[in-house]
Amino acid sequence: VSVQTRDLAIEADAPIRTWFGVGGRADRLAHPSDVDELSTCIQMEPNLRILGDGANLLVDDAGVEELVVALDRPALKRIRIDPDSGRALAMTGASLQRLVSLCARAGLGGLEGLVGIPATLGGAVVMNAGGAFGQIADRLVCVDGLDRDGRRVQIQRDRIDFGYRRSGLGDLIVTAAEFHLEPGDPGVLRERLKTTMAYKKRSQPMAERSCGCVFRNPTLDRTIDDIGRADRRVSAGLLIDRAGCKGLSIGGVCVSDRHANFFVTSPGARAGDVLALIDAVRGRVFGAFGVELETEVVVWRRR
């Protein structure tokens, strides 16, 4: 396929910035300026990798050979809010935190439970970001995206099979999403944001280098005393804590003392340390409870 690349910025041997602050480099890193250039990237390399905020991502020390696309240009980070209709539209590279804050300031409620989740809009939709206070699918109207041929598509909320930390969007690359929100008092909404954020700061190591939750919360296949009942989803952090893993460290990475499902990196840490700690924690939890933990963090490896 002949693809016009004249105006597309592509770096060679470029760093991949993640919240962990570890890992290898991208052989090629593209910075599309808009959706059309993002479509060009897909036509160049359908199996490319999308880099949003780098929060829920671990890149192996060897880096990746596929084209990595960074959603860091202004046109891909725009947010439009219409208080009269109660609608908000955000582009794929928009900060989830900025979206939540702007909606509250405009007197539109419904997304406050997402405060404190580090993500761009696209990644948040694909992972159905959320927690105890709600998930992003709750207020979604529709998703705009590009298929792996670079063609534009729009999918309504009722056609998307959302679940726990998944969207069912498959290979679709999200370019924007629209939300329907409820009118509310801006002062009350901002106070709700402060309360939720204060709780997260008390219970999570938000000031340290971490990707957020490393593991998904598992559903138990049997009742475990003091943990949970069969067929119920339980906290992976609780299992890790009860397995005696808080403070466990390998190399420059340790299990947080504040929240056991968070791994914290220190200067000099490597992605290999994180991967080794993931294996060690999974082994301890399985040995203690017979529960197989699945990773929530996305791992990029060279093929």
Give the positions of each predicted feature.
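Anion-binding (especially nucleotide phosphate/pyrophosphate-binding) glycine-rich loop
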Residues: S2-A129
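Phosphate/pyrophosphate- and phosphate-bearing ligand-binding catalytic cores of soluble enzymes
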Residues: I10, L57, L146-A276, G283, ...
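Preference for bulky hydrophobic residues occupying beta-strand positions
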Residues: A30, V69, A90, V143-G145, ...
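A generic local secondary-structure boundary/capping motif
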Residues: L57, V100-C103, L111-V115, N128-Q135, ...
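A short, compositionally biased
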Residues: P74-A75, A137-V141
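Core subunits and conserved enzymes of cellular information-processing
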Residues: A90, L99, A104, V126-F133, ...
